[in-house]
Regions:
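Class I S-adenosyl-L-methionine
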Residues: 1-105, 109
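Residue-level signal for pocket-adjacent positions within structured domains
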Residues: 10, 127-130, 219
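A short acidic, often aromatic-flanked loop/helix-cap motif at beta-alpha or helix-coil junctions
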Residues: 60-66, 114, 171-172, 210-213
Length: 267
């Protein structure tokens, strides 16, 4: 049996009770933290809290050489730990499909995701989010890929919000900050006629979702780009049209300037 266990968003306590039970019943426990990670816990923290030994696999060990993991799952019960929800990343869907092809039973224990947290913390309605996108580190001289701009533009044309995941390079422990993301988007929007507000576009920065003290700030990209949001992990949301409850929520929960919000309200 191969069980994918979502760890939730922040630390060793973010897992569900069902997830803890899966760990307690596993013969071996693996983990990967290159698609995402828990900002508030180390592998040692997880091992101590859950009283298990964790074998951390890198990208090669998950994507190119998963046979040791499959072999263990054929002989016993294996848990694979993943930050957030296991099946959000294509990597884990692919791993599950390959296990199924080998007639290995699989199971998924869900965890809280960044997408649900983004909606909960900002007050933006979940069903009003369009396609999400990822803003990468490695692109030209620090610019923004056309695919990202197209996603945001097409969502805005439909009045929908865009959740921007920010790049993680686990090998060098690099995590894109919301200020860096806002700076990149402000520059790109300022040069693209699809974004008439340019660097004055409304955005919402979210830092350390799932922690006891997350930060949520709504303002112009130009303002967010010069704001220190502290420790990772960060997200950035570019809102579309705002229902009056969403507009009120951004003002009350994220400190959005009233004069900026007024132009986004649905009349």
């Amino acid at each position: 049996m191969l069980t994918f266990v979502g760890l939730g968003l922040y630390d060793e306590r973010s897992i569900t009770i069902e997830g803890r039970d899966a760990l307690a019943n596993a013969d071996r426990v693996f983990a990967e933290f290159y698609t995402s990670k828990l900002a508030g816990a180390t592998t040692s923290d997880l091992e101590a809290f859950h009283d298990v030994d964790i074998e951390v696999r890198d990208r090669v060990g998950i994507e190119r050489d998963p046979e040791p993991l499959f072999g263990a799952a054929r002989d016993g019960s294996v848990a694979v730990l993943v930050a957030g929800d296991p099946m959000i990343a294509t990597t884990h869907v692919d791993l599950r499909l390959r296990a199924t092809e080998r007639e290995i039973d699989t199971r998924v224990v869900h965890g809280t995701t960044a997408q649900t947290a983004a909606s909960s913390l900002t007050g933006l309605q979940n069903y009003r989010f369009g396609k999400a996108t990822t803003l990468p580190f490695a692109y030209g001289s620090g610019g923004v890929p056309e695919s990202v701009l197209t996603t945001v533009s097409e969502n805005r044309e439909r009045g929908l919000h865009t959740l921007c995941y920010l790049d993680i390079e686990a090998e060098r422990e690099a995590y894109m900050g919301a200020d860096d993301a806002a700076r990149r988007l402000a520059s790109a929007f300022g040069e693209d006629e699809r974004f008439d507000a340019g660097e004055e576009t409304l955005a919402v920065a979210i830092a350390r979702a799932g922690s006891p003290a997350p930060t949520v700030r709504a303002d112009r990209l130009s303002v967010l780009s010069t704001t220190d949001f502290g420790d990772p992990l960060h997200l950035l949301v570019v809102p579309g049209d705002l229902h009056h409850v969403e507009a009120d929520a951004l003002e009350a929960l994220a400190g959005a300037p009233e004069d900026l919000i007024s132009s986004y309200r649905v009349r």
